[in-house]
């Protein structure tokens, strides 16, 4: 947790402090506990997760328990962790260890990565370990070198695109059903951003070919360097126009990338009901008619519950039927639309096949043949085993 980067628009280093790295044994043990509980997919989280590094023997021990340690600040821009060695667990080492020591975890992914410090050692581990997801979230924030410098991002557009090219050379293998999927973050309307700066951002999005991107209008945040030193001088109408234009460009690219999946049959982790299905059920059943999980979903069967974004275990006492009440039987369709993700983080919607209860599919991985494409998702049908 924490961050050492001090981007001028960001408050995280001031609110969460410097990077703190947990002992690798603690992380692996937690993954084992989750696997024993039936979890199939794990995401490692960090503000700059690829900075993870634990130097053995350098931590305080309390009651025989090794404590987390503060991460080093260093120049970065390396191809391999400069502190790698027998006394250090690097991020690449950690990924390989979880993969090898917790074989029942079917998917391991991580977010968010800092692009300048993404070494070949991590790319090699992803390539050589089949249960590591080929999905990288690598925020760019702008396609203008001038704006990147004002943001204190620490890299140029050329350095960022060099990383993308390197990542694709290691990991993009659509011919074996393992394409690399990328996502990014962008801020439009950062102080002093000109039309030329924004056009450079459009060009980067076209060049990067993200499967999705998180796009935001700049707004001053108390406690940041930007609010103290940079006037918020881009008019709101201009921010809104640029935001909408970038969203449209990304939507087109997302749909084009989705089209490359047509006719393929990726493995999909079933997370729960689709948004469309949740809305349909909400219309058909009053909020008071059934117990609700976080996100307003009433689906709890055989010890599993589907929420908005995840699958969670529940006790037998919490189980309830998803069969509609008699008064609603003609309102809800027989088919139930489920939602899940590929290992490349592409959202897939599909109907539970006849003869198979949707509840039994939650938290499983199923093959889905892709038949339709939308800007933010794809649709398909469950393939025969």
Model-derived features: positions:
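Canonical Radical SAM [4Fe-4S] cluster-binding loop centered on the CxxxCxxC motif
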Residues: 1-25, 58
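N-terminal pre-triad scaffold of radical SAM enzymes
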Residues: 1-8, 32-36, 40-43, 268
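Conserved, mostly hydrophobic/aromatic
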Residues: 7, 27, 44, 110, ...
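Conserved alpha-helical substructure of the radical SAM core
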Residues: 14-43
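Short, ordered loop/turn segments at secondary-structure junctions
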Residues: 15, 47-49, 218, 353
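Conserved SAM/AdoMet-binding glycine-rich loop
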Residues: 36-198
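C-terminal, non-catalytic macromolecule-binding modules
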Residues: 196-246
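Terminal RNA-binding accessory module
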Residues: 226-385
């Amino acid at each position: 947790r924490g961050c050492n980067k001090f981007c001028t628009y960001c408050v995280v280093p001031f609110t969460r402090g410097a990077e703190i790295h947990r002992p690798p044994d603690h992380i692996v043990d937690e993954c084992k506990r989750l696997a024993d509980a039936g979890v199939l997919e794990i995401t490692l989280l960090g503000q700059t997760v690829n900075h993870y590094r634990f130097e053995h023997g350098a931590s305080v021990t309390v009651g025989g328990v090794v404590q987390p340690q503060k991460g080093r600040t260093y120049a970065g821009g390396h191809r391999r962790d400069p502190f790698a060695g027998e006394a250090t667990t690097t991020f690449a080492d950690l990924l390989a260890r979880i993969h090898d020591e917790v074989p029942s975890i079917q998917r391991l992914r991580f977010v968010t990565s800092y692009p300048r410090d993404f070494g070949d050692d991590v790319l090699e581990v992803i390539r050589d370990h089949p249960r590591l997801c080929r999905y990288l979230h690598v925020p760019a924030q702008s396609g203008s070198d001038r704006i990147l410098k004002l943001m204190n991002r620490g890299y140029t557009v050329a350095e960022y695109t060099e990383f993308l090219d390197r990542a694709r050379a290691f990991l993009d293998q659509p011919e074996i059903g393992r394409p690399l999927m990328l996502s990014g973050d962008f801020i439009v309307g950062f102080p002093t951003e000109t039309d030329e700066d924004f056009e450079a951002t459009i060009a980067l999005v076209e060049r990067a070919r993200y499967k999705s991107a998180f796009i935001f209008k700049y707004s001053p945040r108390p406690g940041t360097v930007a609010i103290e030193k940079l006037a918020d001088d881009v008019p709101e109408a201009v921010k809104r126009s640029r935001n909408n234009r970038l969203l449209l460009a990304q939507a087109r690219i997302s749909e084009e990338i989705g089209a490359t999946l047509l006719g393929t049959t990726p493995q999909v982790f079933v997370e729960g009901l689709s948004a469309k299905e949740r809305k349909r059920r909400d219309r058909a059943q009053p909020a008071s008619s059934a117990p609700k999980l976080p996100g307003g979903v009433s689906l709890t069967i055989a010890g599993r519950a589907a929420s908005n974004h995840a699958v969670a275990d529940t006790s037998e006492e919490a189980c309830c039927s998803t069969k509609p009440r008699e008064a609603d039987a003609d309102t809800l369709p027989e088919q139930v639309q489920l939602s899940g993700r590929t290992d490349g983080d592409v959202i897939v919607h599909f109907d539970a096949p006849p003869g198979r209860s949707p509840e039994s599919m939650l938290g499983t991985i199923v093959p889905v043949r892709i038949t339709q494409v939308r800007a933010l998702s794809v649709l398909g049908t469950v393939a025969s085993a």
